[in-house]
Amino acid sequence: MKKIFTIVALALCTFALSAQNVERTMEFEGTTRKYMEHIPATPNGSMPVLFQLHGLGDNCNNFSQLGFEALAPNWIIITPEATEATISIMGIYNMNAGTAWAAGVGGENLSYSGFNIGDINLNEGVNDEGFILAILDSLENNFDINTDSIFITGFSMGGFMSNKMAVKHADRITAIASVSGTLGHFQPFEPTGNINTMHIHGTSDETISYANADFNFNGIAVQVGLGAEALVETWRNYNQCSTEPIVYNFEDTKNDGLTFEQYTYKNEETGNKTVFIKVNGGVHTWYEAARNDIDYTTEIYKFFTGQENVPTSIESNVAENFSIYPNPAANIVNVKTDRNAELSIFNATGKEVKHISTNGNTTSIDISELPNGLYFIVANGIAQKLTIER
């Protein structure tokens, strides 16, 4: 369930030492909890808040680099870290499961190496939902927060935790987007209110299976929650959305062996919606525009901000796809777009450092004055990561 980011040009300490991206700790219920905090350099009015929840065994430093800062420079972005979990084997041996959210993930009457080890509910006694809400309370007390724009996204186990927060705290959370993680086996579906939800899942996911959320870990096989389609139907039904979705097929332009389908279910009276992106052939990872037909970060941002994917005419001047090369780059980066586009380059703190207009062909951009590090090139709302390395 751990997502591994291969960003070699930006050391994790760069984020920790940045004026806008800092590592924080909070004393919560007798435990020192850790999280990464990104505050806009120049706030403009009330700020939305986004929580990013990592997968099993991951950490907040690693997962803080999804790239939302480039798309949403006025958002506060918080990446909390889960606590370590252990699995007791017959009370004799404790197996370290890595960092895990108390999201109701587990199963009943499980066996390991031929021995019955009973029920497992990872980190059952940890109050992770209280920790997340305590961070939100602190932000509301210290900043001008847009309380109508509180979002959570999570990958794998972070997706399970996102759905738990949606079920239990719709009064505080505006919308969630879960990726490769559904609703945990031990988490009852008893929502406190309607909430917009998005789910993204690959049909070939072997870590959290598409059909039944089957999970295999160190020889322990268990169904840990709802399958992908069952989760979407559960939220669609609760939100009383139409049974007939708006279907959007993403253009298949990359040679990645994948196709992406989006299903949007709406409740026209309340405005609530449930969105599902089905990744045919997709596995347990976070897909990005550099190599794939869509970029998860961009699609989640569009969902949170109410932007919808609709078919565009051939005359549209919006760059539907663009590529960058070389990447990493040293002094020159080439940007190829299929239509006219406005390009912006943002640094890792979300500050725009360059803006260029293109004519739909290949544009060479001089980046020699920019220091080494992680950047984001954004073309009409679509972002790609760029590493500058010399």
Residues of each region from the PLM?
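Bacterial Sec-dependent N-terminal signal peptides
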Residues: 1-21, 312-315, 351, 376, ...
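Catalytic active-site module of serine/aspartate enzymes centered on a nucleophile-bearing elbow/loop
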Residues: 293-310
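Short beta-strand/loop motif that positions the catalytic acidic residue
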Residues: 199-201, 205
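Serine-hydrolase catalytic machinery in alpha/beta-hydrolase-like enzymes
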Residues: 26-39, 45-151, 168, 288
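C-terminal outer-membrane/trafficking sorting elements
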Residues: 315-390
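A domain-start/cap signature at the N-terminus of enzymes
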Residues: 4, 17-49, 61-62, 75, ...
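Acidic catalytic loop of the alpha/beta-hydrolase fold
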Residues: 205-208, 284-286
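Acidic, glycine-rich loop-and-strand cores that form catalytic or ligand-binding grooves
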Residues: 220-257
